[in-house]
Regions:
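Active-site acidic/histidine proton-transfer and metal-coordination neighborhood
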Residues: 73-139
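N-terminal pre-domain/capping segments
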Residues: 1-88, 94
Length: 139
């Protein structure tokens, strides 16, 4: 495959503070990673910085928070927090005009039996995905 064929599918992770600048210089997409840390979803300063990073770019992935979030949690309260944070991420991505989200499934083999995980995943994701815009991609 030629280099040009891949170029429009390459994204730099915003974890690196220079990612937006490098993406602009090289015609790459940007993965917005500032919201991997859930409290940043509610921080106006972080949102402002992300908007600045997005300037001059046109291809994005939005990385939702994941630490301590578990869609298949045994504890219903943990599941509620997870749902809240994922909804916040999807809403914020939409507000930013981003239609592609990275959301971790939360499988921890030392904690969940695979059967439980699959069963609970279907319940969790069916409800959440039904509320997202049809043009939004979750990976």
């Amino acid at each position: 495959m030629r280099r040009e064929a891949l170029w429009d599918r390459l994204y730099l992770s915003g974890i690196d503070g220079r990612a937006a600048e490098l993406a602009r210089e090289n015609g790459l997409g940007l993965e917005i990673a500032a919201f991997c840390y859930a409290p940043n979803l509610e921080d106006p300063a972080v949102l402002s910085a992300v908007r600045s990073d997005m300037a001059g770019l046109d291809r994005f992935w939005f990385h939702a928070p994941f630490a301590e979030l578990a869609p298949c949690a045994i504890d219903p309260l943990v599941r509620q927090v997870t749902e809240k944070r994922y909804r916040q991420a999807a809403d914020l991505a939409q507000d930013l005009g981003v239609r592609r989200l990275v959301i971790h499934g939360g499988f921890v083999p030392q904690v969940y039996f695979p059967e439980w995980y699959v069963e609970q995943s279907v319940l969790f994701w069916r409800e959440l995905l039904a509320e997202l815009p049809p043009d939004m991609t979750i990976a």
